[in-house]
Structures are given as structure tokens and as C-alpha cells.
């Protein structure tokens, strides 16, 4: 999403200065954008108040200890973010899914801190397409309702990725700035590498045998679903694929999913047609490798997005409404399944796996039609109105 955002901005505003707010250390020499440190403590210091003062003291003490023990880490810079924000013209939030009753209070407060900072420093803000809700908060999170109602009224535009999220924000919190839009990666027709990278990135992907299917699991599915039931499902799905002379590849879209890939491979320890790819693919590499498959069985949202963007059909095994609405955009809703505990319809999944084996070429054409429709609009077109409106 970051690379698409930079590409879209550079296309519209070639001379703009772009900063990626991150807690990580990136080699900026590789990119056509800069970074600004965006750690929790720096955010709290920039927000001020008692919490900000406390975090400032903690930072000073921590740096003093590092000096005493000669810890080789850059120190200081407590007010970097506070000095930086008044100079910014626009904040673009490209979070994926951070607000809803499935997340803990602290994580949601940190998400809302982004809006608090924009509001405090009077910076225009756009929340790019992301998932919201449900908001059936337990008693200890009830205060979030008032915070969401107040803070999400500040951004110039709040893009909800799903209809359900848009309806919840409009009806539950009476927000007037909400619009619905598909995922920004799906809307992007082409990533302009020259506008994003200072050096052409090296893309390394393994060779994939013909007549192959990718399986892209998601660790979160095993948190929302039942482990043994899911492993049994994967075993039966892979049996269906193998019986159709298909090569099966297990690969991860996120680092944390390698353990799940390994668990599934352990179901077929001696079968040479079940391949475990341990590669830590970049988003560009994942995009390149997914094109090699006839279709994919995916549980990662952006794994499905990259598949659809390359007109690769998917059977989606998901745990939230966002998966079904994504499939709906691509005329693929029959292939999206809820695999949360007590919701696994194993017979239907196996039925549609067999159907996909027979019809994946026809499904590709349906996806092409859906993708063409999605790409007729672009959420970044709103920026001209926001900046100059």
C-alpha cells in the first residue's frame, strides 16, 4: 500500500515531499521518499499533556541509561515529530484494519492517536480504504464510542473498504465524511517503479511447476477458528488438488504465517508434490510469484488482493466480512468462506475447490470484468479536492 500511495502521489504532484511515518529504520537511499520517526513515545510527546510529559521523562531516563552502559543507539530527538507536524500539508493514513471490537483498547487508541495528532496540528487528513467495525464493544471499551464519533469526524474523508463498515460509521456515529471505496492496491492500474524507487528493486522468485495452486494461510484464522478443524480442512482440500494432478505450493504473505505453512506441510511429509516455500517474499515478489499459479487458496486479505489484481482466481478462507465483500467486487462471492469456529462448511469448500479446478479459466474472465469496473475509479482522485478545496 505504501508503494502504491507514493506512486499515486508522485503521478499527481511530481515535486511533493513525501515522508513515510514509521518506527522502523529504512535505507532511504533505496526509495523516492523520506522517513520520519513515528514511535509511540514521540507521538505522545507531540500530543502533549500528562502522558506526553511522562513519556518525555521516560525517554530521557532511558537515554541516560544507554549512555551509562554505552548502548550503541541514536539518542535524543524527543521533539522531532512535534516540530515536524506543523510543516505538513496532508496526512494520508493507509492502515488496513485497526478499529473494531476485535482489537484491544490500546491498539485502537494508538490508531486514534494518528487522528489526534492531525487535529492538534491542524493538518488535513484522508483515511484511505480500510476496514471498520463491528463496534460491539464490551463494557471496558465503551469510551471508544465517543472517541470515534468525535475523532473520525475530523478527517476530510474517511474511506471505508466495505459497505458494512461505511454503514456502521454513518449510522452508528453519524459521520458525514464517509465514502466507500475498494482497496487502493486493487484500484491502482500500474505501479510506477521510477516514482517509488531510487534503485530498481531486485525481485527473486522460485521456479513454479506448471499446473500449480498456491495455498496462502493466515495465522489469525487459527486464532479465530479451531486448529484441528482447520488442519483437517487443509488436508482434505490438498487431497482434492493432488487427486487432480496439481502441484501444491505453501507460501506466506506475512512472516508470521511460516509456522502455519510448516504445520500444513507436516500433513504430507513425504509427498514431493506438496512444496513448502520458506521465502520471505516482499510485496513485489509476492505479486510476481502469485501470477505463476492457476488459482490460489488464500486467507490473507492482501494475498487475495494481489491474486485478483493479476486475475488469478481465489478460494478465500477468511474470518471477517472484508473477504466476502472483496470477492463480491470480483464476481467471486461463491468462493469466499467463513472459517471461524462453528462456521466451517467443509462440504461446500471441497465442492467449490473441485469446481475451481474445472472452471478457473472462466473465473479469470469474470475477475477481469470485475477488476476493470473497480479500476474505473481511484480513491486518490479526492486529493485535489482535499488539498485545494
Predicted regions and their residues:
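Active-site anion-handling motifs in enzyme catalytic cores
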Residues: 1-389
Amino acid at each position: 500500500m505504501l508503494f502504491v500511495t507514493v506512486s499515486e502521489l508522485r503521478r499527481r504532484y511530481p515535486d511533493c515531499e513525501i515522508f513515510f511515518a514509521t518506527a522502523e529504520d529504512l535505507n532511504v537511499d533505496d526509495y523516492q521518499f523520506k522517513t520520519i520517526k513515528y514511535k509511540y513515545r514521540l507521538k505522545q510527546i507531540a500530543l502533549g499533556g500528562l502522558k506526553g510529559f511522562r513519556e518525555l521523562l521516560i525517554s530521557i531516563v532511558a537515554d541516560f541509561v544507554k549512555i551509562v552502559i554505552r548502548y550503541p543507539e541514536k539518542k535524543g530527538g524527543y521533539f522531532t515529530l512535534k516540530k515536524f507536524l506543523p510543516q505538513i500539508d496532508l496526512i494520508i493514513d493507509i492502515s488496513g484494519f485497526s478499529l473494531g471490537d476485535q482489537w484491544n483498547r490500546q491498539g485502537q487508541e494508538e490508531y486514534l492517536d494518528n487522528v489526534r495528532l492531525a487535529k492538534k496540528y491542524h493538518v488535513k487528513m484522508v483515511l484511505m480504504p480500510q476496514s471498520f467495525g463491528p463496534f460491539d464493544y464490551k463494557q471496558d471499551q465503551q469510551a471508544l464510542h465517543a472517541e470515534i464519533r468525535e475523532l473520525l469526524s475530523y478527517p476530510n474523508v474517511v474511506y471505508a473498504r466495505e459497505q458494512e463498515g461505511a454503514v456502521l460509521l454513518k449510522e452508528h456515529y453519524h459521520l458525514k465524511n464517509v465514502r466507500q471505496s475498494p482497496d487502493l492496491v486493487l484500484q491502482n492500474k500500474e505501479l510506477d517503479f521510477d516514482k517509488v524507487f531510487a534503485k530498481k528493486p531486485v525481485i527473486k522468485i522460485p521456479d513454479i511447476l506448471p499446473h500449480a495452486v498456491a495455498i496462502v494461510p493466515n495465522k489469525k484464522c487459527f486464532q479465530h477458528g479451531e486448529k484441528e478443524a482447520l488442519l483437517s480442512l487443509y488436508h482434505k482440500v490438498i487431497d482434492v488438488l493432488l487427486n487432480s494432478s496439481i502441484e501444491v505450493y505453501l507460501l506466506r504473505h506475512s512472516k508470521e504465517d511460516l509456522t502455519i505453512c510448516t504445520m500444513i506441510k507436516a500433513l504430507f511429509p513425504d509427498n514431493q508434490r506438496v512444496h513448502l516455500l520458506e521465502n520471505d517474499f516482499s510485496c513485489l515478489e509476492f505479486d510476481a510469484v502469485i501470477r505463476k499459479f492457476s488459482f490460489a487458496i488464500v486467507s490473507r486479505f492482501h494475498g487475495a488482493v494481489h491474486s485478483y489484481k493479476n486475475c488469478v482466481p481465489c478460494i478465500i478462507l477468511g474470518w471477517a466480512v472484508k473477504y466476502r465483500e472483496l470477492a463480491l467486487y470480483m464476481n467471486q462471492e461463491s468462493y469466499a468462506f467463513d472459517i471461524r469456529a462453528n462456521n466451517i462448511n467443509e462440504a461446500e469448500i471441497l465442492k467449490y475447490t473441485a469446481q475451481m479446478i474445472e472452471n478457473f479459466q472462466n473465473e479469470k474472465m469474470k475477475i477481469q470484468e470485475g477488476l476493470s469496473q473497480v479500476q474505473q475509479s481511484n480513491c486518490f482522485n479526492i486529493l485535489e479536492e482535499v488539498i485545494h478545496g
